[in-house]
Amino acid sequence: MKVIKTIYQLSIFVAILFFCSNLTFAQLAEDYHPIKLKGEIPSDFLKRIKGDVQLKYENSLRLNSVQKEQFRVGTEYILRDIFQQGNIYFNDPMTDYVRKVGDNLLYGTDLANDITFFVSRFNVTNATTWQDGTVIVNIGLIACLENEAQLAFALAHEISHYIQQHPYLQYGRFVKKQQVENNSNVFVQNTDRTLNYELEADSIAINLLKKAKYNYNEGSKVLRIVRREYERDAISFVRYLSSDKFEIKEINLCKPISYQDYMENESVSSKSILSLDIRQRKLIKRLSRVEYQVSLKNYILAKDLFKKIQSIARFELVEQTFLSSNYLRSIYEALSLLNDFPKNKYLHIKVSENLYYINSYNDLSIIDRIFFDQKKIEDEVYADFCCFINKLTKEDMRKMVFGFVQQQYQNYPSDERMLIIMAKTVEMVYDMEYAKSYYEKYVKLYVDGEHFLMAKKKLEQ
């Protein structure tokens, strides 16, 4: 009877979990509220802010006491800076999910208490490992992955770096090289060793995935994703940004130089790309020698749960690139998400807000300051969009931005975010006299609003 009751309770729990997952997707279809750090700060988070890190390694390179202390202090300083700056999430669904996948990999090992997984706000498609057992996964990576097994490979790769003491070895060999004078081969040797560490971590990661019953063949796809060799569907910015105030025409568009051409023409170092290429070929070769097991899975946790977490990471990418003033990238990420969530209010409003700031920079003739990805763009659609923005005249930019913002305001006339964007845009494109009614509406509707004092001050001028 007890067993039947337990099974019944478990089935209810699973049903609730499934319902919550669907409910979250329904919410994402309509709107999104960026993650805010709240609640009690976890002890593992505070530990890194306080600098209470314990590095575990065998001193195979025989560093002296001063060098070991420098390694500890350096690790402590960088981690404290990353965590204090608010770059790491806590009490959030992404971190919980990543840790569950990590637990699957560490189950039955002696490492469960040594490694702690965190998720960062960084948009780079990457993850990092520290010798104290800290593993940080960027939202930029989570947003691009296609399934749980790929995330498992990324985590297993970082776990392998910790197991093999690669952070310590990199530091130790760097210190030893500082003692060698006039060594012209230092950089080449260091690059070769770094590649060897990556190849070693890839190989060990396959064993970890195999043991945890994950489909290790997904590993080579992760390297493809890191190289940005994957399809990304984004809605047409030509159609989306056009309005009755400004219609984007063929004459406004341009075809910028491709990233690959830039690499060849400007002699930019391609060592990182070459390294990934070697890793991918070696990994595919390694996988071809492993006997495939039918029982291996792309998902151990629920597939819907991964999709939900990936979507959250993509929404966070829109928000974080905006907060870092990377307005062009934020719009591009929003355009990509609009394929899956065409009626999401947050996305439409965030594009409006990004455009407002782009126009502000353009009016001041300093628009070049927001082209963070200039000459580093691998995605053709994104490159086309950046080139289009750069080519617009000031007058055309004003028309396009005002037309789009006005269109979104008509769709969401009482939304606090949209109302203040409309007020600021009208003031920027025309003057305060035209914007006055929008500020008055904001002050009337949102007494406790985020922009209430600013709006009130505008009206008092």
Which residues are covered by each model-predicted region?
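Catalytic zinc-binding patch centered on the HExxH motif and its immediate surroundings
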Residues: 118-133
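Catalytic Zn2+-binding segment of zinc metalloproteases
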Residues: 141, 145-150, 158-175
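Post-HExxH zinc-binding segment in Zn-dependent metallohydrolases
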Residues: 178-211
